[in-house]
Amino acid sequence: MEQRKYGFFLFINGNCLCRPSGQSCYLVGDKTAFFVCIINFIFFLKGMLVMKKVAIIMGSDSDLPVVRKAVDVLREYEVPFEVHVLSAHRTPEQAKTFATLAAENGFGVMICAAGKAAHLAGAIAANTVLPVIGIPIKASVLDGMDALLSTVQMPAGIPVATVAIDGAANAALLAIQILAVNDAELTSKLVNARAKAARDVLEKDRQISEEFSRQF
């Protein structure tokens, strides 16, 4: 009796699902090959459907009052996150390991908050291809300008998206916008928030206009 053979080629963006490294996969043989391919495909879809986490890393626990603003925004949008303290100078190996394994551990965006020399965002960006957002912290007599310039002046090829000094809320919103590219529900929440902000401004305009128009 002739043995029936199966050949399955499942590719997403040119990469075989059975070989994430990008190698060609030729599953030709018995039915086991079919089920292996299907199982891999199921796990791939599961990974696509689960929302990625946001990593918030601060160089010191003294940055926490600023970082809390980012935490509040992420909670408002129901985006999963983790908060860690890692120093680019005091714990360089741990910071490198965290960045290297970030994608594997389910993170989609990294937010890094640091003051003064503020090398944290750059050190993280050097060890991951995930988007990195830097928050310069006002932590010295230079009112955060030192941290801003340290964070924003990255060499070509290692980008860091830098928000304003102590701009943690915008850092979280930018992280959400990045995740929303593949998430219709998050996109809807962002659109609704923008619409509400516009309505709030117009209502304030109406109130102020009425108040001063009555004075004449």
Predicted segments, located by residue:
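Cysteine-centered motifs
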Residues: 16-18, 25, 37
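Short glycine/serine/threonine-rich phosphate/pyrophosphate-binding segments
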Residues: 63-67, 91-95, 114-123, 142-145, ...
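Glycine-rich phosphate/diphosphate-binding loop of Rossmann-like nucleotide-binding domains
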Residues: 52-90
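N-terminal beta-loop-helix "entrance" segment that forms/cooperates
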Residues: 83-104
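Glycine-rich phosphate-binding loop
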Residues: 98-136
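Short, Lys/Arg-enriched N-terminal segments with co-localized hydrophobic residues
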Residues: 31-50
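C-terminal binding/interaction regions
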Residues: 58-65, 69, 145-216
